[in-house]
Structures are given as structure tokens and as C-alpha cells.
């Protein structure tokens, strides 16, 4: 039990929540709650982390900040992440591979490798290669939606 408490404190520090260990969720902002959720998932040191729209309810600045938190945690711990998102920029920034799914029933209909170098800084989101990837994914999704 003490080992988990120590890991939890270390994770909270990494995500910028040191000093908030004894707070209730309702006492935290949305971004802080999301950071705590990521810590809760990682405290058991999983090999696989499934995230379903983890940043969708956050404002743009907090969302991008948490992209970087997740990026940094991944760099340190090297777990596999399956990220379900409708945010194309988020997918292109965080992923190594993006899968586009069909309408119901959901099936993978396209796969795109993201060959941008790591670690990715937020500045990459303003580069032509990044923008091209996002536009390509948007086109593929548009084809799916129109079919």
C-alpha cells in the first residue's frame, strides 16, 4: 500500500498536482481532475492505457498542456496508449499511428503512420507536414461521413 502511495505522490508531482493530494475532485478544476485521472490510471504501471476522449471537455490551452503531460509521461514510462478521439490535431500530435473508423458498426477503414520526429513540441502543430497530416485525415473522415 505504501508503494502505491509513494508512486501516486510521484505521479502527482510529475503532472503538477503536488500539494493537492488531499483535495476532493470537486475542489479541482477540470484540467486538474484530468491530470488526477491520468495518475490514477498510471499508478499501477500498466503496459496499456486506454483513453476515450480524455481531453474533450477542456479548454484549448489546458488540452494542449495535457497533451504535453501525456507525451512526457509516455517518454518516461513507455506504455502503449490507445487514444479514442475526434480531435484530429490531438491524434496527429500524440499518436504514432492513426486509424480512421467507419460508421456503425465501427471498423478500421484507413491507417496513417505519423512520421513526425519525437519528442514533439507544440510548435510542430504549426508546421506544414503536421497540417498536411491533419488535412489528409480530415479528407478521409469526410469520405466516410458522406458514404
What are the functions of these language-model segments?
Residues 63-77:
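Helical segment within the ABC ATPase nucleotide-binding domain
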Residues 103-133:
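Conserved beta-strand-loop-alpha-helix hinge in the C-terminal portion
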Residues 23-26, 44:
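Conserved signature/switch motifs of ABC ATPase nucleotide-binding domains
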Residues 2-20, 72:
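Conserved ABC ATPase "signature" region
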Residues 49-52:
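Catalytic Walker B motif of ABC-type/P-loop ATPase nucleotide-binding domains
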Residues 78-84:
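Conserved H-loop
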Residues 29:
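ABC transporter NBD signature
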Residues 38:
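Hydrophobic anchor residue at the start of the ABC signature
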Amino acid at each position: 500500500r505504501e508503494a502505491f502511495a509513494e508512486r501516486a505522490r510521484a505521479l502527482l508531482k510529475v503532472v503538477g498536482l503536488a500539494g493537492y493530494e488531499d483535495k476532493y475532485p470537486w475542489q479541482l478544476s477540470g484540467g486538474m481532475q484530468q491530470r488526477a485521472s491520468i495518475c490514477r490510471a498510471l499508478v499501477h504501471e500498466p503496459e496499456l492505457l486506454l483513453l476515450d476522449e480524455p481531453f474533450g471537455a477542456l479548454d484549448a490551452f489546458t488540452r494542449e498542456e495535457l497533451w504535453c503531460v501525456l507525451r512526457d509521461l509516455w517518454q518516461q514510462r513507455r506504455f502503449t496508449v490507445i487514444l479514442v478521439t475526434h480531435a484530429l490535431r490531438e491524434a496527429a500530435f500524440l499518436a504514432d499511428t492513426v486509424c480512421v473508423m467507419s460508421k456503425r458498426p465501427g471498423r478500421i477503414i484507413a491507417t496513417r503512420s505519423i512520421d513526425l520526429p519525437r519528442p514533439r513540441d507544440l510548435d510542430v502543430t504549426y508546421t506544414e507536414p503536421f497540417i498536411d497530416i491533419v488535412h489528409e485525415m480530415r479528407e478521409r473522415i469526410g469520405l466516410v461521413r458522406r458514404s
